[in-house]
Regions:
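Contiguous, non-catalytic segments that form substrate-binding/exosite surfaces or channel walls
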Residues: 113-219, 227-425, 433
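Post-HEXXH active-site segment of zinc metalloproteases
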Residues: 452-473
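Long, well-structured alpha-helical subdomains associated
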Residues: 77, 480-583
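N-terminal-proximal low-complexity accessory segments that begin disordered
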Residues: 25-91
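An active-site-proximal "capping" alpha-helix that borders the catalytic cofactor pocket
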Residues: 56, 256, 468-485
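Catalytic Zn2+-binding segment of zinc metalloproteases
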Residues: 446-458, 482, 486
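Extended, compositionally biased alpha-helical segments that mediate assembly or anchoring
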Residues: 564-565, 569-665
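C-terminal motif of bacterial Sec signal peptides marking the signal peptidase cleavage site
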Residues: 15-19
Length: 665
């Protein structure tokens, strides 16, 4: 599970104030720029790796090969997102590199923005809104560009410009399998998919594999439905063989025997596609709590599958931030206390919390579904039975959070000044929000996703297409409920009993207002994390109306949502958490569906229009992503003596380089 992006209010309010200071152990040049490009609704940033020079040569070698393995998975994600994505990308790369016509005209500028957007989204659909976006240059001009570089292709041009073809990457309307453009299914409808996997599942299996996680489901010409498994001699084999090659080199530089063992298990899994080996790898991986270097690499998250079953490929290589990790260690050491005092029905609590570990990390390489838009927190593994029996690992990605904050300082305006009600609310955010935002991420990932249990016989897929939204809702609510608990002050995690109010005010402000700047006017709220925030904020607003817990105010034609009663809001968070946990534990699909459809999806048109107009006046970009640092071996007399890190790559430069160097499909 991921906290996908830094929450928009926290990501942009820090243009007013930031409390995080200079990244640890990193001499940042005075002319260093975190923000390096802006276009459409996107901003591109750099992040730094402050602990790089403290790593040993062996650790750097381990990181280098893990990073190469991660980058070689890039083409897999592009193809998973939509079957035409790779052909489109190859044409865009050809035009940018080979076109010798006029590059100063407006239509070429429009083409270039489109290309950058496709690179950012790993395809032709918006990375958050799921809908296909289009070039602003004319179809005729685009066709001319293709012809100029020898890439004439009428079918591909139609795929780019048709308003109906490949309209949605993932849809929630009609037959959500046939109506989605993701490349997980071919020739099958939803019922056929459900029936296929229902026949596989054993409801009495207490340790089930994640059926369908690493495969494409295809109906052949003979009418037989089969899985095409992602493995070295199967689907995506060319990319997987490159990943395996780098993992083999990485294992030779691993920090410990345990790391060598689970890297070997991961390689065995990639060779066979056997999901039992994937589970074995996760069990071994979750035991590694002492290493400085860590990584994820594989088919992990199912957010992009309309049925919440099949996983996209992703990679992340990271190093531990020892000092900041002390905060998360306190949380994990007290996980049983938090579980025991949760406001949910005791039947749905874990009687014994096992193996929860947490740390703060610095990303070194982002890849696949973590690149260029990246999560700021991760909790894995996802299998409920592994979490129950073996525990989980949670991370908060500090240098990504800090990069967001420092990039925001480079902008003169902020959402906080525009959407907060008064100076007191602004002052509270400036004092506490940078800290409370990080702590909420810790609570969400470390404890929220790891909390609770399914009742015996409840399928982990029981909530179907609503599972991702409801799971993120559950984890957010767990964090929100405990933000106000005196236990956090007692543990020294929060400075005082007032700090949580900054998080509460920000969450409501974002969930009911600011986040809609990311949605095109008149469209529905479709992304799981945005849905979860709206569900929570809207439910609490509605349920607290009689007591004026959250008040809608209008001043000078502008709308604000103000928290009047913070303790009462905490009670509402607790009540909703109890209900969401019940829904998950019992697999109550009907209630989960009703909650999402009533509170999470629809946006009031007039309010939406107002938010977009106010946000536009700030000249800010609602979405952010990153370029990776460059890591290169340093040789002396034919021997590698170091691995140097640099932060010089531009956005297009890196995208084009990756398109050549790591092209496998």
């Amino acid at each position: 599970m991921k906290t996908i992006v830094k929450m928009i209010a926290a990501a942009t309010v820090m243009g007013c104030a930031v409390s995080c200071g200079t990244p640890r152990g990193d001499e940042v040049p005075s002319d260093f720029k975190y923000l390096i490009d802006e276009f459409a609704d996107l901003k591109i940033m750099r992040y730094r790796v402050p602990g790089w020079n403290a790593l040993s040569l062996r650790q750097k070698e381990y990181v280098y090969h893990l990073s190469e393995a991660a980058k070689y998975g890039r083409d897999i994600l592009w193809d998973q997102n939509c079957a035409v994505n790779l052909p489109v990308r190859h044409v865009l790369e050809d035009i940018i590199e080979k076109y010798d016509g006029d590059r100063e005209c407006q239509e070429y500028a429009d083409f270039l923005v489109y290309a950058k957007r496709v690179f950012f989204s790993n395809g032709i659909h918006h990375h958050y809104a799921e809908e296909k976006f289009f070039p602003d240059c004319s179809r005729e001009y685009f066709a001319g560009l293709m012809a100029a570089v020898g890439d004439e292709n009428a079918e591909l041009l139609e795929a780019i410009y048709s308003p109906t073809l490949y309209r949605w990457r993932k849809t929630d309307v009609g037959d959500i399998v046939k109506g989605s453009s993701v490349n997980f299914y071919e020739g099958v409808d939803r019922k056929e998919v459900d029936d296929f996997y229902a026949a596989m599942a054993d409801p009495n299996d207490r340790e089930p594999v994640s059926y369908g996680l690493n495969s494409k489901l295809v109906k052949g010409d003979d009418g037989v439905i089969r899985e095409e498994v992602y493995r070295i001699d199967g689907l995506y084999g060319a990319a997987i063989s490159k990943i395996v090659g780098e993992l083999e080199l990485a294992s030779e530089a691993a920090e410990s025997e345990l790391q060598k063992q689970y890297v070997k298990t991961l390689i065995d899994y990639y060779r066979s596609g056997d999901l039992r080996l994937w589970d074995k790898y996760n069990i071994e991986w979750v035991k590694d709590t002492l290493g400085t270097v860590d990584f994820i690499n594989g088919f992990i998250e199912d957010y992009n599958d309309p049925l919440g079953r099949k996983a996209t490929w992703e990679g992340l290589v990271n190093v531990r931030d020892e000092e900041a990790s002390q905060r998360t260690v306190k949380l994990s050491e007290n996980a049983q206390w938090f579980e025991d005092h949760s406001p949910v029905d005791p039947r749905f609590r874990k009687p014994v919390v096992k193996g929860i570990s947490a740390k703060v990390i610095d990303a070194v390489t982002l890849a696949g579904d973590c690149y260029p838009a990246t999560p700021i927190g991760i909790n894995l593994p996802n299998a409920d039975w592994i979490r129950r029996e073996h525990g989980s690992k949670s991370v908060t990605i500090a240098n990504i959070t800090h990069a967001y904050d420092f990039a925001a300082q480079e902008s003169p305006k902020s959402t906080l000044a525009e959407f907060a009600w008064d100076d007191d609310e602004i002052a509270m955010a400036k004092k506490y929000l940078s800290l409370t935002d990080e702590i909420h991420t810790d609570l969400h990932e470390c404890l929220g996703h790891g909390s609770g249990q399914l009742l015996p016989g409840t399928s982990p897929n029981a909530l179907g297409e609503f599972n991702s939204t409801l799971e993120e809702t559950r984890a957010d609510l767990f964090g929100l409920y405990y933000m106000a608990d005196p236990k956090l002050v007692e543990l020294g995690i929060l400075p005082d009993g007032e700090a949580y109010k900054a998080m509460y005010a920000n969450y409501i402000r974002n969930g009911l207002l600011v986040q809609f700047s990311r949605v095109e006017l008149g469209k529905k709220n479709t992304e799981a994390h945005m849905q979860n925030r709206k569900l929570i904020a809207q439910w609490c607003y509605d349920k607290g109306l009689a007591d004026n817990v959250i008040e809608k105010k209008v001043r000078d034609g502008k709308t604000y949502f103000v928290v009047n009663d913070y303790p009462a809001l905490r009670e509402l968070f607790g009540k909703l958490l109890a209900e969401i946990q019940r829904v998950k534990s019992e697999g109550d699909y009907a209630t989960g569906k009703a909650l999402v459809e009533k509170y999470a999806v629809n946006i009031d048109y007039n309010l939406h229009k107002e938010v977009l107009e106010r946000y536009a006046s700030l000249n800010l970009k609602p979405y952010g992503g990153f370029v990776n640092p460059r890591i290169e071996p340093v040789e002396r007399n034919g021997k590698v003596v170091d691995y140097a890190i640099s932060y010089t790559d531009g956005y297009l430069e890196q995208m084009l380089e990756y398109g050549h160097k790591y092209r496998t499909l």
